[in-house]
UniProtKB/Swiss-Prot annotation:
It holds the Pfam family Mur_ligase_M. One of its GO terms (molecular function) is ATP binding. Keywords: ATP-binding, Cell cycle, Cell division, Cell shape, Cell wall biogenesis/degradation, Cytoplasm, Ligase, Nucleotide-binding, Peptidoglycan synthesis. The gene is murD. The lineage of its organism: Bacteria, Pseudomonadati, Campylobacterota, Epsilonproteobacteria, Campylobacterales. It comes from Helicobacter pylori (strain ATCC 700392 / 26695). It is an enzyme of class 6 (ligase). This is UDP-N-acetylmuramoylalanine--D-glutamate ligase. Its EC number is 6.3.2.9. Pathway: Cell wall biogenesis; peptidoglycan biosynthesis.
Amino acid sequence: MKISLLGHGKTTLALGRFFKKNHNEVKFFDDKFLSSFKDSEGFLCYPSKDFNPNDSQLEIVSPGISFTHPLVIKAKHLVSEYDYINSLFDLVFTPTIISISGTNGKTTTTEMLTMLLEDFKAVSGGNIGTPLIELFEKRSPLWVLETSSFSLHYTNKAYPLIYLLINIEADHLTWHCNFENYLNAKLKVLTLMPKTSLAILPLKFKEHPIIQNSQAQKIFFDKSEEVLERLKIPSNALFFKGAFLLDAALALLVYEQFLKIKNLKWQDYRENALKRLNAFKIGSHKMEEFRDKQGRLWVDDSKATNIDATLQALKTFKNQKIHLILGGDIKGVNLTPLFEEFKNYKISLYAIGSSAFIIQALALEFNVSCQVCLELEKAVQEIKSVLSQNEIALLSPSAASLDQFSSYKERGEKFKAFVLKD
């Protein structure tokens, strides 16, 4: 079979290895290739312009590639990673799948839930960790998948047993073109889910037509306190605060519902679940606090790549003066809602990256103190010169990092290095 993999990344490379083992003819197409060549694994790689849909029997698209891309438009047999994997399931092996999506919190919640479900041999994958084809080859029985809006957009058949949607705020508008498309992508899976499946959804979307028309069973939530009350857990029983408390509460809710489906009693598992969850360590670059050599508090929230994540970070330090490093690739999002919230804070901005002058213009409009630093190191230097012991220095950029860094991780690591440098 002639297979075209659109995009040359972790997901498609894993698929390429699987197809190669099964004696298929595999070609990769990617904008980053300027001419044809063989990569280090011996795969044939071509520039996107060389793709011929008449010379291909199956195309699987890397989720980061937009539906407006010429490769996607030309493809005649386009299938998502999720739908292809779904086509492999049979009577011999079909895993139980829990999907977690949302603008923010999905990585943390996926990691928390996977840990809670360890006794059921749960493994995480999708957007984090392992590509789905590798989970399939390992025959892992329970998949907890962090699922992006990109993957959901392209998927037309596959659905999970439980779908958790944590939140939806403006993000990835360059890819989706507008917020309505982004919202519809996040909700699309509900059109595929049958009566035997369960969707756990934000209350504010209860009246949305897609949700109203979905056959799936539904649970709606609003605040973490309400979720914990439903589970008969006092809010002080968990050691998390702010957005992380909601992540933890939702992980427990999904766990409770999974146990219910398995005809197991929540009360038999509750105390152990709380103990394990309270031992969970939040990942790097997510509200990660550290102190400089003078004992002043700095916070690495480099993973805050959108407005909502930054707003959640600010709430944690509501009563302190905040020196906020903001900027990067804002992905077509209007930052005005963020600036409207700044009036509730004592805040000084340090603008970096490709959106620095957009931030400066908004700061002037909203009368917020702002220095255009462009470079992260310059922003750190400026803050170092004025930061007092009772103030907070916060990197929570509300933007992706790829205009200046290889990833949000590199941005966070460099931030810490600049702070700790003499």
